[in-house]
Design a protein with these regions (language model features):
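Alpha-helical transmembrane segments of multi-pass membrane proteins
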Residues: 1-186
Length: 186
């Protein structure tokens, strides 16, 4: 119920943002602010309404979408909104891996998964795809870094995005191989 209320709130803000945009009732910054609120309410509704891996997938995809909009349309607020979502998605995937490793432990020997075709690996691959897309857009000469972007934040994320991408890619395959062999020998 709470998730539906939050989505309803996002829908109301979405309708208002469309009216503001179509009728040109306010400055573009107001439109971007209201649209940002829509995204914030959707971001809040995701963990309230969904569980585990779905939250990670939606947050990673939403971060990629916001980063792409922010960089290609030169709307700095969307790029700034993407950075906390990247952090949330990273924390969420670590929690997903932790719960997956606990689920497939020797105490639960009857629990088996199909290698590669399981929700945990799918989540990891979607996360890697989203971060690869973010990294591509960030490094693309077609989409230059906005002038007003905080240089410290830009420098930190210029290092973190590829590092997270490499680390998650490695651990996704490592975890999949480990779970497979644990199922056979434990």
């Amino acid at each position: 119920v709470l998730g539906l209320f939050t989505l309803g709130n996002a829908l109301i803000h979405f309708i208002i943002s469309i009216v503001v945009y179509k009728k040109e009732l306010a400055d573009k910054n107001i439109f971007y602010f209201i649209s940002g609120l829509v995204l914030v309410f959707i971001t809040i509704a995701i963990p309230v309404q969904l569980d585990g891996n779905w939250v990670t997938m939606f947050w990673a995809l939403q971060a990629a979408l916001l980063f792409w909009i922010g960089r290609t349309k030169k709307v700095l607020v969307y790029e700034y909104l993407s950075y906390p979502l990247m952090v949330l998605a990273f924390i969420s995937i670590i929690q997903d891996w932790n719960s997956a490793n606990n689920f497939y432990s020797p105490e639960f020997a009857n629990n088996t998964i199909l290698p590669i075709f399981n929700i945990h690996f799918l989540t990891s691959i979607i996360f890697v795809g989203a971060f690869a897309f973010i990294n591509y857009v960030k490094r693309s000469p077609n989409y230059s870094q906005p002038e007003k972007l905080n240089k410290d934040i830009a420098q930190i994320f210029s290092f973190l995005i590829p590092a997270v991408l490499i680390g998650v890619t490695y651990y996704a395959f490592f975890n999949e191989i480990q779970v497979y062999w644990n199922q056979i020998y434990i």
